[in-house]
């Protein structure tokens, strides 16, 4: 059997096989567990955040190491009723994020138990919303992970360590690609990681 080397090379270069399901997980911040599933057929990403807080949790992506230009998913679980909610935000600087005009994250589930908030939400890889980043296997991004002390999404997150490193969401088996930056910050603080999505 003869193989066409050009065809073999092209197939090897494809970032995602048609119909592929990719799953991964990471602990970017102490008390903050992130997992994700990318469904190529549905062209969606499902994100689960489990954080040691009874306040808000957030997951975001940005083109740089900070909040400027960030595309953010913020979620809460009401302490009294247990009702969960998720909202789509964007940020221009180190101030409170602004809610998007178009809401592209859909809540799958949310719960609180033993001081932990767990929220799962999904969105299209490409939403068509100018306030969202389009996710693809060939793009590089910074991942933002944060949590707050209360359900008020205007409540600032506490001071903590900040770490930046590269992770490819479409190739989670590669693990940590490179450590970029570690420093202690004061409020506002955010844990950030560069990844290719």
Residue ranges and their predicted role:
Residues 1-11:
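Classical eukaryotic N-terminal signal peptides for Sec-dependent ER targeting/secretion
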Residues 9, 15-197:
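Extracellular-facing/secreted segment signature in eukaryotic proteins
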């Amino acid at each position: 059997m003869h193989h066409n080397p050009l065809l073999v090379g092209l197939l090897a270069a494809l970032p995602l096989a048609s119909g592929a399901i990719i799953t991964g997980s990471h602990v970017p911040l102490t008390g903050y567990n992130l997992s994700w599933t990318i469904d190529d057929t549905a062209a969606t990403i499902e994100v689960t955040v489990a954080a040691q807080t009874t306040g808000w949790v957030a997951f975001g992506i940005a083109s740089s190491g900070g909040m400027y230009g960030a595309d953010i998913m913020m979620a809460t679980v009401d302490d009294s009723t247990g009702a969960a909610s998720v909202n789509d935000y964007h940020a221009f600087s180190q101030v409170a994020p602004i809610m998007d005009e178009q809401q592209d994250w859909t809540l799958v589930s949310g719960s609180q138990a033993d001081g932990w908030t767990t929220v799962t939400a999904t969105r299209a890889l490409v939403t068509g919303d100018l306030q969202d980043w389009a996710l693809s296997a060939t793009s590089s991004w910074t991942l933002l992970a944060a949590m707050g002390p209360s359900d008020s999404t205007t409540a600032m997150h506490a001071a903590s360590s900040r770490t930046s490193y590269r992770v490819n969401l479409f190739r989670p088996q590669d693990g940590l690609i490179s450590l970029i930056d570690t420093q202690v910050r004061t409020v506002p603080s955010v844990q950030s990681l560069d990844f290719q999505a």
